[in-house]
Every structure is written in structure tokens, then in C-alpha cells.
Amino acid sequence: MTTRLFIQDVTLRDGMHAVRHRITPEDVGRIVAALDAAGVDAIEVAHGDGLAGGSLNYGPGSNTDWEWIEAAADNLTHARLTTLLLPGIGTIAHLEQAYRLGVRSVRIATHCTEADVSAQHIATARELGMDVSGFLMMSHMAEAEQLAEQAELMESYGAHCVYVTDSGGRLTMDGVRDRVRAYRRVLDPATEIGIHAHENLSLAVANSVVAVEEGVTRVDASLAGHGAGAGNCPIEPFVAVADLYGWKHSCDLFALQDAADDLVRPLQDRPVRVDRETLTLGYAGVYSSFLRHAEAAARRYGLDTRTILLEVGRRGLVGGQEDLIVDIALDLLADTTA
């Protein structure tokens, strides 16, 4: 492989789900400084559900996006400051404010079959001169050719890169391979392809490796896998594998290991790992950020979290429908008491 990998850290965006969007700007600054020194190419910062995601439905943040982004900007020297925006949650005004604070790259995220709602936000980001990626969430819910059609739409709106985004940690290596190949068949050769993996089936590193073998150049990863559900692709083992394969990148493996163990793991109030609940996310194909919501409902109503998650998967809930988890719990409770 001759192309250098672009490794984007998502500890401070997807990882917000793992700490219920509660982290101090001081901790953000420390983590960003460590990541920057370790050579990652980009660092994504926002509420777990993107700009303006803090709410009763998604979970309020301990601080505003702007406080976190300012703390990140103050500690960056080399890496590209990045954020995430979901149309319908974040607005053009939020995007413009992020740009004023130093954000120069954005991922515009939609459900995997709803790329058309990203057009305005992608176009505005391009007008601002930003690096722009399309982020097709829950990519396992669309077959490869259908997903590629959505990627083609995002490209037509101006995206420099489009991601296969395995939000549920449900894809296997064949699923990743098929989707990346489908993208490559329809996208312009100049348009990059990215992979965003979750660890719910313990396949995040394997899926990311397969993606790179198929031509992906942008890889999402996080310190200690810090992210929703069982976490994202853990950056330390992925970089180790990249070294073993001789792939070009700019990361310092030992520095990443130190940041993961010394800065990130101590912040976790629930271990980010594959366990009975997070494995069920991948098994049922459930949006990874639903984990903490389902666990809260299970505690409240005396149910098994896995039972709730299986029903969430059966009903095909997607990101933004967190409020329906309580409805499902009440339905299950009624069934057990009938």
C-alpha cells in the first residue's frame, strides 16, 4: 500500500456516549494534546450526537460543544480539528460557529437511506472551505448497491469522502468488503472512502483492516476504543496492525497506548468492552448509542437490557428514536404481567 492512511480520532465525539456526554474542558484539552503529539491526522470533538446534540432525548452534555471545541483548539498544533453534524439536530448556524472556533473539517451524518437531507449542509461546508465527509450511519441496514447510491448522492453534493459507518457494529468483514467495493464502483476515483467501525461483535479492527485492503484511506478509531456500545475501533491495536502490514501513517503507537491507559480509561464510569449487553447491540443490529438508554430503562422497569435491545432491533429503530426505548420497555413489561 502506497497511500498514507488518514487516521481520525473520535474519542471526544463518539466517546462522549461512553461517559454520557460528561467531560470537562480540561480533560478534553489533555486528551487533544496527547492525540496531537501522537500524530493522529484529525480529532473530532462534539456531543456524541453531533453539534447541538445535547438534549433530554439524546442526553444533556456537561458542557456546550463550544466549550469543548475551544478547549480542543487551544491544544492543537498539527491535527485537523473536526466535528460531526446531523441535519435536523445541528443547523447551518451551528456549522458556521464551529468554523469560527477553528473547526476545519466536518462529517455530515444521516441515516444510511437519507443522504438527500445532507445537501444543504455539505454545500455550506464546502463554501466555508472545509474538508467535508458524508457519514452514512447504520450502514448495515442498506444493501451494498443501495448504500453506494446514497454515497453517490453525498459525493454529488460536494463531499470529499464518504464513510461506510457501522453504527450498530453489525457488519462482518464480507459486509464491509461488499460496501467498499460498491462505493468504489460508482464514486469518482478522487473521492475518498472512509470506515467507521464499532466493536460490538469484536470485529472493529478486522473490519477496518479489510476496508483498507479494499482501498479505504480514512479510518476512524479511538483511544481504548472509547465510544458508544462496545466502543469504536481501538486506535492502539489498529495502528499496531498497520505497522505490521507496513502501511504508511503518522501515529506513534506507544504515545497512543499511554494516552489510552493514562487519560481515557480512568474517565469511564462503565467499561467500554464486549459484554452481554454490548454484544447484543451487534447481534441485533442496534444503534450503539442506544446502550445507555436501554440500560436505564431496564433498571427502571426491572427488565433484562438484552430483551429490550432485541426488540429494538426487531422494530428497526434508528438514530433519533431513543425516546421509543421507554415505550418498548413498557410494552415488554405489560407482556410479562399480562
UniProtKB/Swiss-Prot annotation:
It catalyses: (S)-4-hydroxy-2-oxopentanoate = acetaldehyde + pyruvate. GO terms for biological process: catabolic process; L-leucine biosynthetic process. Residues 5-257 form the Pyruvate carboxyltransferase domain. Its EC number is 4.1.3.39. Pfam families: DmpG_comm, HMGL-like. One of its GO terms (molecular function) is manganese ion binding. The record marks 13 as: Transition state stabilizer. The active site is at 17 (proton acceptor). It comes from the Bacteria. Mn(2+) binds at residues 14, 196, 198. Substrate binds at residues 13-14, 167, 196, 287. Belongs to the 4-hydroxy-2-oxovalerate aldolase family. PANTHER family: 2-ISOPROPYLMALATE SYNTHASE 1, CHLOROPLASTIC-RELATED, HOMOCITRATE SYNTHASE-RELATED. This is 4-hydroxy-2-oxovalerate aldolase 3. It comes from Nocardia farcinica (strain IFM 10152).
